[in-house]
Amino acid sequence: MINDSKKSVVYLVDTLTISKESLSVIDSLSNKVYLVLTKRDLLPKSVKNSKLKEYISNLTLIKDVFVISALKNNGVTELYNELIKNNEKSVYVIGYTSSGKSTFINKLLMLNGKSGNITTSSLPNTTLECINIKLNDKLTLIDTPGFVSENSSYNFIDVDIYKKLLPKSVIKPKVYTIKKNFMIILGDIFRIENNSNEDVNLVFYFKNEIKLNKMRSIRNKLLKDKDKLDVKVSDKDIVLEGLGYIKVVGYANLTMYTLNKKMISVRNKMI
């Protein structure tokens, strides 16, 4: 439907959990794409927008990249002005569930003196069909149903627990040095252990209230009945789709256990 039209696409991606899957959507589109990295307010202020744009430039050829926080109204006006400048009469707004699509649309409505009444939710399928939203005589948004990723943690975690794990405020990274045969446990969801001969430095970017427990891994059976994934990485990010990510500093030989290994992906280091 979208490719059959000549309308441009505003594609929203959650900055925290950028992945190959989320960026592969761009390859399926023949339209002009404005790539919008959302939820900027969750990352530390020390992370510059220019750094995020540089990171994206190494992953996609898209030149129109915007970094926004709809909640804080950072970058939204800039994007709106660009759409008007380019004479975009009508654009599709697309994105995965929890990408911040509805919050973004509500902010544009309010900027144009209208009530922001689009339903926002962290759960899939809030929008069931395409909705035309006229901002003004110059621009109409076509709100589309959110994509539901088969790799999202949402698919494997109890709904009420999942909602409690979603970050709502600036994330304070938690740094751990893990010795060989030690591990970090994230609730009943995730276990990561160091099999390297050297110490491993891991930086966790998750909701601040999430408790991380460090303990010995030898003879510890916690989560060992779950899906297992072994990785050897160097200066990479390990993403838990929809929840956050772990930055691996230097080389690491790691074993992970989680509810479903689809939840885990590895990407080039973002920060």
Language-model regions: role of each:
Residues 10, 34-35, 66, 92:
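A structural signal for isolated positions on well-ordered beta-strands in alpha/beta enzyme cores
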Residues 101-102, 143:
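Conserved long hydrophobic alpha-helices within structured protein cores
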Residues 103, 107, 168-171:
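Short amphipathic alpha-helical patches
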Residues 42-99, 105-121:
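Canonical P-loop GTPase G-domain recognition
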Residues 1-9, 13-25, 30-34, 40, ...:
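Helix-rich effector regions associated with P-loop NTPase G domains
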